């Protein structure tokens, strides 16, 4: 690659650090009285953690103090919100639990917290929420939100796929294939649903 490409990559890295530093300096709380707190913590938190992980391992000019600030933000602002979500009785459609799973995994990787990462993997397989792989996608591929709208269905599937890809990048291929390729079955059902009529069962929360 040319020097221009190198400069652009460095500029993007510096801007990413600037954004992460601004968040870690200013963000002290999510909520606590907004019903969407867990979804916000999942979606925004996973993006911040993924960006921090990339910077941490690819840009030598990031400082230990900056990384420590990002770690503190995730542990004190984002993770407590999701801890509360995971401990609560199921009360949301499954895309929330799927989003929380991918976020927990991203947090665990960046923080090098194996217990946190494993907690997310366990939830993916065995959690009580609508967002686990076997609760979100039935054996025939119908998703928990198929009777709702396709935007949320594909959002939920995408969150589960991101969790699987995260595991794959850690050397774990099993999540993609779990329950006889249940994720693939969900994608196939959803594609057929959007191409024409398919049978489905009404589901409730």
Language-model features, listed with the residues they occupy:
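Extended ligand-binding groove/face enriched in aromatic
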Residues: 5-95
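Solvent-exposed, acidic/flexible segments
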Residues: 13, 34, 38-41, 67, ...
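A structural signal for well-ordered alpha-helical segments within the folded catalytic domains
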Residues: 14-17, 21, 42-46, 98, ...
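Long, well-ordered core segments of solenoidal/helical folds
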Residues: 15-31, 69-87, 115-140, 182-198
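Carbohydrate-binding/catalytic loop surfaces
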Residues: 39-51, 88, 99, 103-105, ...
